[in-house]
Amino acid sequence: MRKINLASPVVKWVGGKRQLLERLMPLFPDTYTSYCEPFIGGGAVLFALQPENVIINDINSELIGVYQAIKDNVDALIKRLEQFENTKECFYDVRGWDRNAEFYNQLTDIDKAARVIFLNKTCYNGLYRVNSAGEFNTPFGRYKNPNIVNENTLRAVNEYLNTADVTILNTSYSEAVQGLPENSFVYLDPPYDPISVTASFTGYNAGGFNRQDQIALRDCCRQLDANGIKFMLSNSATEFIQDIYSDFNITIVPAKRAINSVGSKRGCVDEVVVRNYE
C-alpha cells in the first residue's frame, strides 16, 4: 500500500508520540499482519506506520467520533470547521455545547467532531481536558492564526482510513485486543504513571487511570504474550512501572513533554518502552 505522506495527527493529544517517533520506529517489529492500537490518541504512531490491517480504539467517544467523521464524511467536516471563528465568544459558545445534554445529544456526528477539532486548535496549549462531569473545560488560547481546518491533513487521513482496512472502536483497551489474529502487533500508549504527585494528568477522560488500572493493563499484556501476540508499550520510567513489567524487555528513552500548561516545564523526562520481543 502506498504511504500517504500528509497523513498525520489532526488533534494534539496528551502523551502524543510525534516527537518520539525517531526513537520508537527502530523498536517496532519488522513483520506483522495486523496492527492494533487500543489507546489511539492523536495517532502519530499509526500514521507513521500506516499498516494495512488496523484496529484503532479509544475510550474517549469524542475522540473516536473525530476519526469516524474523517473516515465517513470529510467534506462535511471541512465545511463545518470553516464556519467556526477564532474568537473568544465563538470558543466559549462552542465549548458550552456539552453543558446542555439535550442540546448536545441533538447535534450531528459532524457537529460533535468539528467541535472537538475546533476546541483542540483554539484552546489553551491544545490541552484536551474534561472535568468530572465529562465537560470540556480548557480555556481559550488566544492564538492569532490557528490552523482550524487544516484541509490537506484531513483529506490525507481520510484517504488512509479508507485505503487501509481500518476498524474503529470505542471501547475499553481490554475489549479492543480480544480475538486478535495470529501475527498481530499491539502498540499500547496508556495514560502514564505520574512521575510525581502533581504530574498526573488523566483529564482526557472523566474516569482517570490509577495504579490498579496500570496493573490490570500489565495483566492484559501478559495475556497477549501468552497468546503469542507481540506488544510494545510506552509509559513513564517510574520505579513502579519498571517493576511491574520486569518480566519483559525494557528500553529507556528520553522524551520531551509536548503538552504542559507551563512552558518552562516542557523538559526531557525518561520513558520506558516495554516489549515482549527482541
Outline where the language-model segments fall.
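Conserved proline-anchored active-site loop of SAM-dependent methyltransferases
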Residues: 24, 35-49, 53-59, 117, ...
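SAM-dependent nucleic-acid methyltransferase catalytic core
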Residues: 2-19, 30, 73-187, 191-201, ...
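Short catalytic/ligand-binding loop motif for oxyanion handling, primarily in non-cytosolic enzymes
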Residues: 44-47, 64-65, 125-128, 177, ...
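Short, polar loop motifs at secondary-structure junctions
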Residues: 39-44, 154, 235-239
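S-adenosyl-L-methionine
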Residues: 1-39, 44-45, 49, 263
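Conserved S-adenosyl-L-methionine
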Residues: 27-88
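Conserved acidic-Pro-Pro-aromatic motif
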Residues: 182-273
